[in-house]
Amino acid sequence: MATQTCTPTFSTGSIKGLCGTAGGISRVSSIRSVGSCRVPSLAGAAGYISSARSGLSGLGSCLPGSYLSSECHTSGFVGSGGWFCEGSFNGSEKETMQFLNDRLANYLEKVRQLERENAELESRIQEWYEFQIPYICPDYQSYFKTIEDFQQKILLTKSENARLVLQIDNAKLAADDFRTKYETELSLRQLVEADINGLRRILDELTLCKADLEAQVESLKEELMCLKKNHEEEVSVLRCQLGDRLNVEVDAAPPVDLNKILEDMRCQYEALVENNRRDVEAWFNTQTEELNQQVVSSSEQLQCCQTEIIELRRTVNALEIELQAQHSMRNSLESTLAETEARYSSQLAQMQCLISNVEAQLSEIRCDLERQNQEYQVLLDVKARLEGEIATYRHLLEGEDCKLPPQPCATACKPVIRVPSVPPVPCVPSVPCTPAPQVGTQIRTITEEIRDGKVISSREHVQSRPL
């Protein structure tokens, strides 16, 4: 059980009588508790308090008119704890005892009535607590299952979409591969065609060179024929001029065979042309082989680069697909987290509202308990004073030797209420009563701080003021 700290505050007031005697001593005790104090039968205390208010406040009205004048007042044993009357008793001691007996009977009847009402209120409060139904949060389990099914379907659909996107990307990659191969073959074809065109140009140049050489040979042949013809003409002219007059014998070298020389020159030129043709053909073949080797190596390098590019593209596409899948998963998880946070925040708000309501109810119940505890202590104090008064009445009933004077006061004298702690002072008929003194109130407040059944501190404050 939690430690309770209660600070009781006791107020004690005394009221002086109108004839110079104490008309009664009022002691009002109240408790100011810090925390929660628990008293037995709180519901009964509440009923007892409410009934005590209605019952005790009307004790003054239950007295007969013959005993009290119109100026008689009662405090209901709550304010001052006693009663005083400005009228006078009209009767003997027997009538006074009868009045006190009637008052005691009324008080006992009121006590029984309060006990019955207390029991009734306790039963009603118990029934009310039994019929209270606690707040139950709604069950969302069925909705959670439906949401999980939809989430599974969404994940399956997302995986199917990712698979279709992967297939589409693979088809695009295959199309890119075929396009790249086509472009490679087209570039190779263009290179070969360019080489063929270059070789054709070289062949045309060689053909032109051959035609030039043939033209030069033909011109040389024609020049040789012209020279031969001119030589023969000159020889014939000289022969005609000399005739038979001169017989010249020339011992000269044998004549040169021009046909043989031309044939030799032709053979030399043909050999030279053949050598040039062979050299050009060898150079062309060498250049072609080198170019083919360069083309092959370049094509191999290009093929390797294209293969690497294709692999990198596939890797990039796969990574992009995985990134999209991760983004979609992250978005779904974020949405799920947001929904979960919203749901739990709403539930938390409901729980907080419920907790606030319960705390408000607890604070109200605590305030009611404190108020009922204070009223209960007040009623206990009233009960103690009433028991003392009953004991006083019993003492008055048993001791008949103390009697009132036979004749009332000649002047308007106020009656004296007998209290065990203060002896009664009757009025003297031959001496007029002095004027009534002022009535004063002395309030003594004792504040004690109690924790775990031990008194920690105690303070006393006395305040006097006239009425």
From Swiss-Prot:
UniProt-recorded Gene Ontology molecular function terms: structural constituent of skin epidermis
Family membership: Belongs to the intermediate filament family.
Name of protein: Keratin, type I cuticular Ha6
UniProt superkingdom: Eukaryota
Head: annotated span: 1-93
Lineage: Eukaryota, Metazoa, Chordata, Craniata, Vertebrata
Record's keyword terms, sorted: Coiled coil, Intermediate filament, Keratin
Domain IF rod: residue ranges: 93-404
Site (Stutter): A342
Chain's gene name: KRT36
GO cellular component: cytosol; extracellular exosome; intermediate filament cytoskeleton; keratin filament
